[in-house]
Amino acid sequence: MNSPNPQTLSTPAGKVLCVADLRGNISQLNDLVDQTGAKLIVHCGDFGFYERESLNRISDRTLKHLVQYSTLIPPALRTRLLQSTVTPDSLRSQIKASTTPILSELPLYLTGQKSLKVPVYTVWGACEDVSVLEKFRSGEYTIPNLHIIDESATAVIDIGGVKLRLFGLGGAIAQHKLFDIGDGISTIAGGSGTMWTTALQIGQLVDTAQKVFDATETRILISHASPGREGILAQLALTLKADFTISAGLHFRYGISYNEFGVQGDQELYRNKLAIAQKNFMDMWEGVKAHVEANVSDEQRVLLENCLGVVNRLPAVNTLPNDKDEAAFKNMWNFNLPDAASGLLLLDINQGRIATETRSHGFNFSYRRNNVSLRSGSPAVA
């Protein structure tokens, strides 16, 4: 299911469904495929990589968060589970006793009781069980049509005259954890029901991208955290020569679509944004450098150098009209997705052209019709 070798899918013109934050409600993917006619799915985490045994590994705080935002749990049951009188032990007991999934539907897909209608390419999010991901990476767990995109596993999708190259980086971005793998046993990091990105993963992704580079491909960086908020991800997108970034993690009611040229006054402001990210990383790096360099293997040292190369990847101060950094500044497009329960993005690909369509349930403003104070002449502006 998941290997270092590139995965390839070839399909005629069609739609790519992009969603985020299923939070274990995996059946929603099939419903969305029926609604949109999508040929495949890109997912940005949180996917819901939890099994029944995960309950023993999740911290009380994370468990409460999962219950609060799960779309698997009926509202009345959620209200009962989150009552102040419910202790952490009682909450765990009720989840364990439930005959229907509360944490995730993943076990139903592992046993074959449920299946995915189309190929799904996903990264993991910030709330996942690292032990479950380790089982997928080792091959102990497999689900037909589920492909995990990470620092060493990439995919190519030949669709509608375009070759999409998918790169992925899952987990939260936490500066103080970039050199901590937590309970992970390989290169991925996590613990207590959460996962985060490490510096070595960033370095490995750069290595993977270099090995498979093909100028005829259209490159997409899929991440859980947003490159718009995390400068190191914006630097990574530049390093990978990404044409698109697709991310999640902000939980807005509407999707976001932008390029840096559209939101920055000039390229120098963009450079300053990345320079701040560089400084934050280097300040942290100076504190751990001696310890890390004394304990990494030769192979890890190469990956570490790759990561430092990303951190030091800043656009030039003065650029020529055809400079590659200026091209990225104007042409690299960024999408941040709402939760799957709130909206989606469709890439409609045909004859080499990638069209986009966004859908959102949006905000409900009907309450304003009943706002007596505004109707009676209150100021329209603050």
Give the ranges of each region predicted by the language model.
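Conserved beta-sheet core of the metallophosphoesterase superfamily
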Residues: 119-121, 220, 225-351, 355
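Intrinsically disordered, low-complexity terminal extensions
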Residues: 1-14, 19, 131, 333-337, ...
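Beta-strand-turn-beta hairpins that frame and shape the catalytic cleft
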Residues: 7-16, 153-168, 173, 177, ...
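Short coil/turn segments at secondary-structure boundaries
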Residues: 29-33, 54-57, 134-138, 179-182, ...
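Active-site-proximal loop/helix segment associated with metal-binding centers of metalloenzymes
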Residues: 65-91, 158-220, 363, 370-377
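Low-complexity, serine/threonine/proline-enriched polar segments
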Residues: 66-99, 103-107, 166, 274-319
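Core catalytic region of metal-dependent phosphoesterases/phosphodiesterases
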Residues: 25-156
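Active-site neighborhood of phospho(di)ester-bond hydrolases with catalytic His/Asp-centered motifs
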Residues: 18-20, 41-46, 76-80, 92-101, ...
